Amino acid sequence: MNTDRHSFKSDQTDALSLSVYNVGYEKCQGLHSWGSGVRDHYLIHHIISGKGVYKTPQGEYHLSAGDTFLIYPYTVITYTADKNDPWEYYWAGFNGSDAEFILDRAGFTRECPVISADFGSELKDSLERIYRLSGNRSSDLVKMTGQLYITLGILMERSGSQSRSGSTAKGYVTKAKNYIAHNYTLGIGVENATDFVGVSRATLYRAFMEY
């Protein structure tokens, strides 16, 4: 992919428990913006270069290469590329009964809809593969959905947030760091971080000491 934008939009989005709605890639121009507005599906963006700002009702997130952000359905949002170093990203939009459960296990929340983790090229390559599999035949839809599950599995594995009930100490630390990094301008404290992670202050302290 070597031009500024490639995308595909499916005309069948309700056939499976998880269905790809759209997928693509874009190298944005400076200050290119979407919103304010709402989407009617979940939408993940994975930034591979540059930076920009993502605004939701819960906060404002200054993001850069390596960050992955989630747009929730029917939530008023805006996202804007940086003027001097505009972002370049891959995206995948999807719906289905499995979506909320999987995204929750990957560590996304409305309060912190961003994951910062070292994916190398794995996540980018997986999103690009969804695009390369795109088509409106039933077989295409199944292949795209299969690759979407793989993509979300990568997010779950690398984010360190397998589940709220069974997170490891490393998962606690990763989740707390993500929350702090993207909400520090709101004047948050330790209690906000522990409430978000879902553990006691002592448990989070021990996790940070371990990692």
What are these regions (language model features)?
Residues 36, 55-56, 80, 115, ...:
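Short, hydrophobic secondary-structure boundary micro-motifs
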Residues 2, 6-8, 15-110:
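N-terminal regulatory/effector-sensing and dimerization cores
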Residues 27-28, 75, 155, 180, ...:
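Generic helix-packing signal
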Residues 95-101, 117-182, 203-205:
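An amphipathic alpha-helical interaction segment
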Residues 110-116:
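Short, charged recognition helix plus adjacent turn
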Residues 186-211:
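Basic/polar phosphate-binding segments, predominantly the helix-turn-helix DNA-binding elements
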